[in-house]
Amino acid sequence: MSFKDFDAPKYKYKRKSLVEILKNEGIKSQKVLDAILKVPRHIFVPSEYLDLAYENEALPIGYEQTISQPYIVALMTEALDLKGDEKVLEIGTGSGYQTAILAELAKEVYTIERIRELSEEAKKRIKLLGYSNVYFKVGDGTLGWEEFSPYDRIIVTAASYDIPNPLKEQLKDGGVMVIPIGGRDFQYLYKITKKNGNFYRENLGGVRFVPLKGEYGWKD
């Protein structure tokens, strides 16, 4: 099946409506809005939630994981301030939707998922959409992906009680990380900028993410 076969006009219309909602919610980056308009979110959600694919809400994708609310995807991507030549590390591939948005806007995307089944499904979707700048790994995201570090940008799509040390080390000086930090039930989304080895935080507001599990994350 090709992209044209499943991206029916009704879905394109729904994406346009979603973009208008995101504008009203305060998303300003036209590049981010264009990526949201282009990437078919409906292929990243389970079939039973197809009718909700373009609602501004998070949806279950199995394995106690979710596909993030489109507003949060847009907010996190906007905070990364991508120019098009960056190497990005994504922690938590999930459905692959955020990965596809990043692939639209960055030079290279390295994405890690601890649940093999999710990673394999995401890889199929990314291939179907024709992206050739995404590299997948199954493993502990809190350890990062040292082989290809340092990264210009790091995005973490699960909640941590603090910034995992390996991610601090793998972020290029002058780089930006977007990560939810807090407890299990509520967090704040932070834009972290690394300058001369120091880390500066900007609070982007309250959020709720699934926990980041791993050696430098939650243990259970």
Curated annotation (Swiss-Prot):
Keywords of the record: Cytoplasm, Methyltransferase, S-adenosyl-L-methionine, Transferase
Domain of life of the native organism: Bacteria
Subcellular locations according to the entry: Cytoplasm
Enzyme class: transferase
Active site per UniProt: S68
GO biological process: methylation; protein modification process; protein repair
Pfam families cross-referenced by the UniProt entry: PCMT
Substrates-to-products reaction catalysed: [protein]-L-isoaspartate + S-adenosyl-L-methionine = [protein]-L-isoaspartate alpha-methyl ester + S-adenosyl-L-homocysteine
Family stated for the protein in its record: Belongs to the methyltransferase superfamily. L-isoaspartyl/D-aspartyl protein methyltransferase family.
HAMAP family according to UniProt: PIMT (MF_00090)
Job description of the protein: Catalyzes the methyl esterification of L-isoaspartyl residues in peptides and proteins that result from spontaneous decomposition of normal L-aspartyl and L-asparaginyl residues. It plays a role in the repair and/or degradation of damaged proteins.
The protein, known as: Protein-L-isoaspartate O-methyltransferase
Organism (species): Dictyoglomus turgidum (strain DSM 6724 / Z-1310)
